[in-house]
Amino acid sequence: MSVTTFCSLKKTDKCNIYISKRAFSVFLFYLFFFLFFHFYFLCSSSFAVIIHESEKRKNIMRRKRSILQIFENSIKSKEGKCNFTKRYITHYYNIPLKIKKHDLPSVIKYFSHKPNGKHNYVTNMITQKNRKSFLFFFFLYNKYFFGKQEQIRKMNYHEEMNKINIKNDGNRKIYMYPKNDIHEEDGDHKNDVEINQKRNEQNCKSFNDEKNENARDPNKILYLINPRGFCKGVSRAIETVEECLKLFKPPIYVKHKIVHNDIVCKKLEKEGAIFIEDLNDVPDGHILIYSAHGISPQIREIAKKKKLIEIDATCPLVNKVHVYVQMKAKENYDIILIGYKNHVEVIGTYNEAPHCTHIVENVNDVDKLNFPLNKKLFYVTQTTLSMDDCALIVQKLKNKFPHIETIPSGSICYATTNRQTALNKICTKCDLTIVVGSSSSSNAKKLVYSSQIRNVPAVLLNTVHDLDQQILKNVNKIALTSAASTPEQETQKFVNLLTNPPFNYTLQNFDGAHENVPKWKLPKNLLHMIKEREK
């Protein structure tokens, strides 16, 4: 119908106006477009992401900005209004959003209350990236305590139920709990006394934690050094023993301690591992695991005579040194082995070619070496030596024998190098160095030595019970690291001890070296046994 025709119609005339499907689709599109952006800009005024979690987990609304950033920005804002939350959360969740002023004590005591009267706003529920477990951010905008910005304590993401403490002028703590923890006044309570007691203990603990946090001396710093702890060779050796214990019935015999750490070895002994030094202690035909430190060819021959099932957990870096010693000995080289002659790793390497290998323990031993001018020389080192001492010995060897050769990539383990490098960067700024490790660990003792030669006191401790608190007097800055055979949980025990009363050190992570951890598989014959057992 044209405009002229429409205008010529009388009032009594009837006119039917039809809308095409295309026009109707366009209309719906623009309507949806308008509502979407209206919803988006309205959401931008709030401080959190609103997620509609229905029974089928549909219609999840997200914000591009980080949840934490939005949350923290809202806390910093002076107004602290939650317009969007009030409107939508009440509809999506059955969480009481209105609480009377005189009901606040009952909220603290975890009793029931009805959502009415003058109110505070409780904000929304948000989801983590995996969409499986949910966090609850609770924020109370209290008009009765208006005038001072609320202080929010960050939550622990790994707890199933999270809470936020809000401190007002009266230093009063108010705790809000998720939907499942809130009951109606006329409802039943499950173990009210136990629940109240548990909540009160948590509240007191949170209050004490914040009080201790405020009481920290900013000058007292605990530097937790990275990298630290297990190297790949150690973790591979431990995993080898654990897999054998799963695959076969205990006992499982291990030649020498699998790694030089008493805590690790005691744990494996409880599971059924037996550490031996003499192969006569192993029954014929039984399984024998070689430790991460390597083994000499003579031991392998004895094992074959006893028809033992050998599983070699030797660190691949130690095995690399063995291969070079064998190869150079066949090429008529004389081998100079830098290390400690009583160390199990050096014993294994030396016995690869005892007729042409010379052990050097210190700089003075270099003076005792005499070779013909045309003699081919090759040097290797114990993988856990101090870089400082080793550098001095190597320099003297090169000065005396300019034609001497070595492994292109070096002999010292990457983990030993990285842990010493990281410690050397920070220890000179500290008053004390604490190395977590066993007294039988060579690389642990070298970490202590590395700090001491830089005039920084250092102690080697196996457990937190070995710590003498007297040494912490007048100590403001501590460098904390651990040996390559030390479990991380032992280091964390020191962190927990030193960052809590009575010490109250402030924890700071220090990245002293970048570490590329190699990807080494378990011994081949063990992997084959595992596959056969699975079949």
UniProtKB/Swiss-Prot annotation:
<dbReference type="Pfam" id="PF02401">
    <property type="entry name" value="LYTB"/>
</dbReference>
<feature type="active site" description="Proton donor">
    <location>
        <position position="345"/>
    </location>
</feature>
<keyword id="KW-0411">Iron-sulfur</keyword>
<comment type="pathway">
    <text>Isoprenoid biosynthesis; isopentenyl diphosphate biosynthesis via DXP pathway; isopentenyl diphosphate from 1-deoxy-D-xylulose 5-phosphate: step 6/6.</text>
</comment>
<keyword id="KW-0933">Apicoplast</keyword>
<feature type="binding site">
    <location>
        <position position="441"/>
    </location>
    <ligand>
        <name>isopentenyl diphosphate</name>
    </ligand>
</feature>
<keyword id="KW-0479">Metal-binding</keyword>
<feature type="binding site">
    <location>
        <position position="413"/>
    </location>
    <ligand>
        <name>[4Fe-4S] cluster</name>
    </ligand>
</feature>
<feature type="binding site">
    <location>
        <position position="260"/>
    </location>
    <ligand>
        <name>isopentenyl diphosphate</name>
    </ligand>
</feature>
<keyword id="KW-0408">Iron</keyword>
<feature type="binding site">
    <location>
        <position position="315"/>
    </location>
    <ligand>
        <name>[4Fe-4S] cluster</name>
    </ligand>
</feature>
<feature type="binding site">
    <location>
        <position position="260"/>
    </location>
    <ligand>
        <name>dimethylallyl diphosphate</name>
    </ligand>
</feature>
<feature type="binding site">
    <location>
        <position position="443"/>
    </location>
    <ligand>
        <name>(2E)-4-hydroxy-3-methylbut-2-enyl diphosphate</name>
    </ligand>
</feature>
<dbReference type="GO" id="GO:0050992">
    <property type="term" value="P:dimethylallyl diphosphate biosynthetic process"/>
</dbReference>
<keyword id="KW-0934">Plastid</keyword>
<feature type="binding site">
    <location>
        <position position="293"/>
    </location>
    <ligand>
        <name>(2E)-4-hydroxy-3-methylbut-2-enyl diphosphate</name>
    </ligand>
</feature>
<comment type="function">
    <text>Catalyzes the conversion of 1-hydroxy-2-methyl-2-(E)-butenyl 4-diphosphate (HMBPP) into a mixture of isopentenyl diphosphate (IPP) and dimethylallyl diphosphate (DMAPP). Acts in the terminal step of the DOXP/MEP pathway for isoprenoid precursor biosynthesis.</text>
</comment>
<feature type="binding site">
    <location>
        <position position="231"/>
    </location>
    <ligand>
        <name>[4Fe-4S] cluster</name>
    </ligand>
</feature>
<dbReference type="GO" id="GO:0051745">
    <property type="term" value="F:4-hydroxy-3-methylbut-2-enyl diphosphate reductase activity"/>
</dbReference>
<keyword id="KW-0414">Isoprene biosynthesis</keyword>
<comment type="pathway">
    <text>Isoprenoid biosynthesis; dimethylallyl diphosphate biosynthesis; dimethylallyl diphosphate from (2E)-4-hydroxy-3-methylbutenyl diphosphate: step 1/1.</text>
</comment>
<feature type="binding site">
    <location>
        <position position="443"/>
    </location>
    <ligand>
        <name>isopentenyl diphosphate</name>
    </ligand>
</feature>
<feature type="binding site">
    <location>
        <position position="441"/>
    </location>
    <ligand>
        <name>dimethylallyl diphosphate</name>
    </ligand>
</feature>
<feature type="binding site">
    <location>
        <position position="293"/>
    </location>
    <ligand>
        <name>dimethylallyl diphosphate</name>
    </ligand>
</feature>
<protein>
    <recommendedName>
        <fullName>4-hydroxy-3-methylbut-2-enyl diphosphate reductase, apicoplast</fullName>
        <ecNumber>1.17.7.4</ecNumber>
    </recommendedName>
</protein>
<feature type="binding site">
    <location>
        <position position="442"/>
    </location>
    <ligand>
        <name>(2E)-4-hydroxy-3-methylbut-2-enyl diphosphate</name>
    </ligand>
</feature>
<feature type="binding site">
    <location>
        <position position="343"/>
    </location>
    <ligand>
        <name>isopentenyl diphosphate</name>
    </ligand>
</feature>
<feature type="binding site">
    <location>
        <position position="485"/>
    </location>
    <ligand>
        <name>dimethylallyl diphosphate</name>
    </ligand>
</feature>
<keyword id="KW-0004">4Fe-4S</keyword>
<feature type="binding site">
    <location>
        <position position="260"/>
    </location>
    <ligand>
        <name>(2E)-4-hydroxy-3-methylbut-2-enyl diphosphate</name>
    </ligand>
</feature>
<comment type="similarity">
    <text>Belongs to the IspH family.</text>
</comment>
<feature type="binding site">
    <location>
        <position position="343"/>
    </location>
    <ligand>
        <name>dimethylallyl diphosphate</name>
    </ligand>
</feature>
<dbReference type="GO" id="GO:0046872">
    <property type="term" value="F:metal ion binding"/>
</dbReference>
<dbReference type="InterPro" id="IPR003451">
    <property type="entry name" value="LytB/IspH"/>
</dbReference>
<feature type="binding site">
    <location>
        <position position="441"/>
    </location>
    <ligand>
        <name>(2E)-4-hydroxy-3-methylbut-2-enyl diphosphate</name>
    </ligand>
</feature>
<dbReference type="GO" id="GO:0020011">
    <property type="term" value="C:apicoplast"/>
</dbReference>
<feature type="binding site">
    <location>
        <position position="343"/>
    </location>
    <ligand>
        <name>(2E)-4-hydroxy-3-methylbut-2-enyl diphosphate</name>
    </ligand>
</feature>
<feature type="binding site">
    <location>
        <position position="383"/>
    </location>
    <ligand>
        <name>(2E)-4-hydroxy-3-methylbut-2-enyl diphosphate</name>
    </ligand>
</feature>
<dbReference type="GO" id="GO:0010322">
    <property type="term" value="P:regulation of isopentenyl diphosphate biosynthetic process, methylerythritol 4-phosphate pathway"/>
</dbReference>
<feature type="binding site">
    <location>
        <position position="485"/>
    </location>
    <ligand>
        <name>(2E)-4-hydroxy-3-methylbut-2-enyl diphosphate</name>
    </ligand>
</feature>
<dbReference type="GO" id="GO:0051539">
    <property type="term" value="F:4 iron, 4 sulfur cluster binding"/>
</dbReference>
<feature type="binding site">
    <location>
        <position position="442"/>
    </location>
    <ligand>
        <name>dimethylallyl diphosphate</name>
    </ligand>
</feature>
